[in-house]
Amino acid sequence: MKKKISQAIIKFFKNENLIIDESKLIIEKSKNFGDYSSNVALIFAKQNKIDSLKLAQTIKNQLLSENLNLEKIEIAPPGFINFFISKNEYANIVSEIIQKGENFGRYSLQKKINLEFVSANPTGFLHLGHLRGAVIGDILANILEFSGNFVFREYYINDFGSQIDRLVGSVFSRYQQIFKKFALPEEAYLGEDIIWCAQKFFQIYANKFENSSLDDLETYKIFREKSIEIFLDEIKADLANLSIKFDVFSSESELFRTEKVQKNLANLPFVYKKEEAIWLKTSKFGDQKDRVLVKKNGEFTYFSSDIAYHFEKINSNFKPDFLINIWGADHIGYVDRMKAALKTVNLNQKLDILLYQLVKLFKNGQEFKMSKRMGKTFTIKDLLELVDQDAIRYFISERSYNSLVEFDIGLAAKISLQNPLFLIQYAHARASKLLANSTIVPEKILKFEAENETILISKLKQFEEIVLKITKNYKINLLNKYLLELANLFNSFYSNSKIIGNQNQNSLLSLTKAVQIVLKNGLKLLGIKAKERI
């Protein structure tokens, strides 16, 4: 309805040759002044040299002449327009939801999107920071696909450079400690996951490398490849335990092996040489300063391979319309330089970067600290032992990606209406139980008049708006908030309405069915089970 009203107003302005900025046209949900209200006449009266009340009245007359299923339109000084939906429209909404079922809320946007997320270094287990990026990426991909887009989910494996050298040195040292005293490198990773990896290595190779040295290239190669493989397998297992999937795992080292880094940089404009290093003039395109691509010793920087990686994605067979990268907030310094690099070849419009904030984990009022360097990392494996997958996905996604998440393990595990996820699943289970023991007669005319019914139906219709909004601003938490509001409205309706035995029973059961459908559709987008019973 909101969309219909907006389109009708825009059509009116254009037919009357009046000035309107569509981006400033706002149709708001109203509690006290009809179902929707707008100040469109106030905003554009001066530009069109018309009295705002007169303009509002003219808009009213035009919209009432169109088939918008409005019961009435009221004007309030100095020019507000209040819209009241026809009771027939509420019945139409419920019928539409039931008819469309799992397809209610879908769009057909038809964009091809490359979505890169998680992309954790294969140097240990996934921790809570990685978890947030994983959940955000997976849910966003679900919603983008639900909206009719084609989404290619990609994980970029950072398996090249100094962090891999540190991994090899750390695992090799822990492996040697199985046989004898052996000093750790100064920059060693200290987590228990490194000890675990060394033990895995021992299970495969026994004492084969007891007297070996990393100075031996073959020994280094085996420790490098096997350590990466062991951790990458665990990363994939953790993601699978959260029902998070990818279409491809792309390797940074593979870009170098196939010389794609070199080839992509060879065609890059705005490159120059200074102090025996090769630089990219990113300062010309919004970056704070120019960036080094190749150091004076001939070593490529991480930035150079990252540029090549983005070019490879853009020029892949998938041919995405745009890219979305989901990075931790600690990557903020890379945003301007990456966008500047794409601007050098006029590709800036193809990249959106979301920076998500940290996760703080609380249990019994105490916060867990996370530091891989100090061996105190709290991992996804640890969390899955305390709360289930559904709770993790809900509580990690319930805040905007650019806000801190405080994850309360106690609340997440609580079987109580204080737990927002339990409350939502409880509403779905209530609806399911009622419908399982009742029959809806599809031929009967639906009728809704009570205020708690019409409010609930209006909330159901908002599901479409929420889905579309998330495809534009990527704030998946809007879905959590919406489902909680819908569940609260339904629970109140259920508790305060006599449904079975009511003379309007068929309509109320149909409304319950519509609620069940929307809750299930929303939970599915979050990757959460819609429980039939609790």
From Swiss-Prot:
InterPro entries: aa-tRNA-synth_I_CS, Arg-tRNA-ligase, Arg-tRNA-synth_N, Arg-tRNA-synth_N_sf, ArgRS_core, DALR_anticod-bd, Rossmann-like_a/b/a_fold, tRNAsynth_Ia_anticodon-bd. Gene3D superfamilies: Arginyl tRNA synthetase N-terminal domain, HUPs, Isoleucyl-tRNA Synthetase, Domain 1. Its EC number is 6.1.1.19. It is found in: Cytoplasm. It is an enzyme of class 6 (ligase). PROSITE patterns: AA_TRNA_LIGASE_I. A motif ('HIGH' region) lies at residues 120-130. It holds the Pfam family Arg_tRNA_synt_N. The keyword Transmembrane helix does not apply. GO terms for cellular component: cytoplasm. Keywords: Aminoacyl-tRNA synthetase, ATP-binding, Cytoplasm, Ligase, Nucleotide-binding, Protein biosynthesis. GO terms for molecular function: arginine-tRNA ligase activity; ATP binding. One of its GO terms (biological process) is arginyl-tRNA aminoacylation. It catalyses: tRNA(Arg) + L-arginine + ATP = L-arginyl-tRNA(Arg) + AMP + diphosphate. Its main location: cytoplasm. Belongs to the class-I aminoacyl-tRNA synthetase family. Monomer. This is Arginine--tRNA ligase. It comes from Mesomycoplasma hyopneumoniae (strain J / ATCC 25934 / NCTC 10110).
